[in-house]
UniProtKB/Swiss-Prot annotation:
Site residues by UniProt (Plays an important role in substrate specificity): H228
Modified sites of kind N6-(pyridoxal phosphate)lysine: K229
InterPro entries cross-referenced by the UniProt entry: PyrdxlP-dep_Trfase (IPR015424), PyrdxlP-dep_Trfase_major (IPR015421), PyrdxlP-dep_Trfase_small (IPR015422), Ser_HO-MeTrfase (IPR001085), Ser_HO-MeTrfase-like (IPR049943), Ser_HO-MeTrfase_PLP_BS (IPR019798), SHMT-like_dom (IPR039429)
Record Pfam families: SHMT
Biological processes, Gene Ontology terms: glycine biosynthetic process from serine; tetrahydrofolate interconversion
Catalysed transformations (reactions): (6R)-5,10-methylene-5,6,7,8-tetrahydrofolate + glycine + H2O = (6S)-5,6,7,8-tetrahydrofolate + L-serine
Protein name per Swiss-Prot or TrEMBL: Serine hydroxymethyltransferase
Cofactor(s) essential for the protein: pyridoxal 5'-phosphate
Organism field: Coxiella burnetii (strain CbuG_Q212) (Coxiella burnetii (strain Q212))
Gene name in the database record: glyA
Amino acid sequence: MYEPTLTVESFDSELAGAIRDERRRQEHHVELIASENYVSPRVLELQGSVLTNKYAEGYPGRRYYAGCEFVDIAEQLAIDRAKELFGADYANVQPHSGSQANAEAYMALMNPGDTLLAMDLSHGGHLTHGSPVSFSGKFYKAVHYGLNAHGDIDYEQAAQLAQEHKPKVILAGFSAFSGIVDWQRFREIADSVNAYFMTDIAHVAGLVAAGVYPSPVQIADVTTTTTHKTLRGPRAGLILAKANPELEKRLNSAVFPGSQGGPLMHIIAAKAVAFKEAMQPEFKTYAQQILKNAKAMAEVMKERDYTIVSGGTQNHLFLVSLLNKNISGKEAEAALGRANITVNKNTVPGETRSPFVTSGLRIGTPAITTRGFKEKEASQLAHWVCDILDDIHNEKVIADVKQKAHELCGKFPVYQELD
């Protein structure tokens, strides 16, 4: 049924209700999931624009459909801005997600059965870094390095595994590591075995763009990322690379027609405006505050006798190990959720429980920083988290924290300009 004047509210009240309730949840819950953020009204607007109607297989100036002259402008803006923002020589803005960006980069760099050396999932890696349940572990032979006893990446182990297995690709990147990656050291390990060096900066892309976290873009052969998380754009992917005409051609072919058809032009336009937002001076201030808030929270939890993997944080997240607390990550996540504090359970080094239960929590500060929280609020929030974890079955404590969290959220609305 096509009726231009009929709203979702009047046509599909069930769906409208779910969206309304999710809007309310985002306003009244404290978001501490490290991979989540709040996009700007501009990003929201573009994702609902008429660009969603246009098929545009191919690349700007080389399309398989007519009528692409205006979406070409949008995509070229996204490409040019991505290259400028990250100091890249090449950018492909068509990947639908970070996972797809990884799959496409692998396709350009490896053949099925080749060896991939990446971080172990239980030490902070990602499913697409060679987990046996992922395409990356099914199509390629995955070998994994982890963290050392000090909670840092075990570069010596990575170098030893590289010499032993001679991987085609060495990947540096993470989903739950709170330190700074030594990109150059990985470059040297890759060069020692004539491997491609690939980086996945999905979690820290916004920090890299702002210049508050080291950039691997001109060190690695290929860099992938999501465009949400710390970058605060739409949920999608991006591939970057330093100059290499042959590799650029293979990357383009891996994206289209290798694994995707028509690009999502409304999402690409949203990427373009998000990249422009990230170029503003205010974005660097935002990224710096993310780091300050994460450090403030981690310090409070350490003072309250909680174990922080790697001993602290140098980015936007930190991992709390509950191995010595007789609390599972699942229990902790649920208890905090009842207090309107959203976190995610996470595996930790030395994990003894299943990935569905876990012994840890991952905590991140991009979303609360977007709301306007600073160190004062971040520290206060960390104390509330500890209050609940200290007495996890005490519903009175949970109810008290829920009220405090509700009041705090009321002082820092997410989308006040849309009300």
